[in-house]
Amino acid sequence: MLAIAILAWGQAGVAINEQNMKFERGVKPDPIKVKPPVDNTIPIDTSTVYFALIDSAQQCIKLEQWQQAEHFLLEAIRSEPSNPSNSLLLSNIATMQRQQGRLNEALRNYSMAIDITPNAVTLLHNRAAVYILLDSIARAQADYERIMMIDESDVESRYTHGMLALNMGDAKTAQKDFNDILRINPNSGMAKQGQGYLHKHAGEYDKAAQCFSEVINVKPSATLLANRADCYLATKRLNDASLDIANALELDPDDPYIYILRAKLNKLRYNRNDMERDIKLAIAHGLDAAEARAMIGE
């Protein structure tokens, strides 16, 4: 007996991250790692066609031959349509489709996998991530609420649920979610980070910067440094903002919003040439030109 192979998570995982959360800079969270699809220790009969097809799919996955891997997994499902392990295979198919930008197909396959294993928390996390990519925020929220009912200790669902609520202006729900995280884990950096976004949303920039600092001192990230820099810009602590922006760019030189922050800094310092340079850099890193200028009031 062997275990069903799953995707190498570094190759084709669905994580809730800065790209698929689509938050504005003011409330964009750090990435949250999501575990691999489901249990990878389900025993199967190695003598069956089902296993042989899965083994072929795994070989393709190792070579990042996603379409061929998908073909073998679909053939495995067709060979044993009532096999409960098909939930895992559908999840792998959905993950590969998500990596290829085939979001509607990924959504359909995650949903079929959930129909087989309705309480699989990781599948619900992954479907919620696709809903976010598709701007179906209400449906993503519903999946996170379902996760919270299944597993009260799942802090990632509460954090992302709270961040989505905050992004829609619902600070009350966000506060409840972050308080619930503190109830589960009084020392949670995730809750402290969420509180920082709440303070920033309310215009309480000094309090927000303090919350971000507590998390940065333990685990610095480009996102948190950029958000703290934004708070420092709002309170005219320009030297502190400059340092955070420089450190954020070292960690993530491809984030266009960090160049926008530096453009704002240069505008406040009346360095117009440097401001224009940073606007161009933000555009070169993928930000729409009109949006870039609007963000710094140009």
Where are the language model's segments positioned?
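Terminal, low-structured helical/coil segments at or just beyond the last alpha-helical repeat
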Residues: R25, N40-I44, I260-E298
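Canonical tetratricopeptide repeat
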Residues: L88-N92, N126, T160-M163, G194, ...
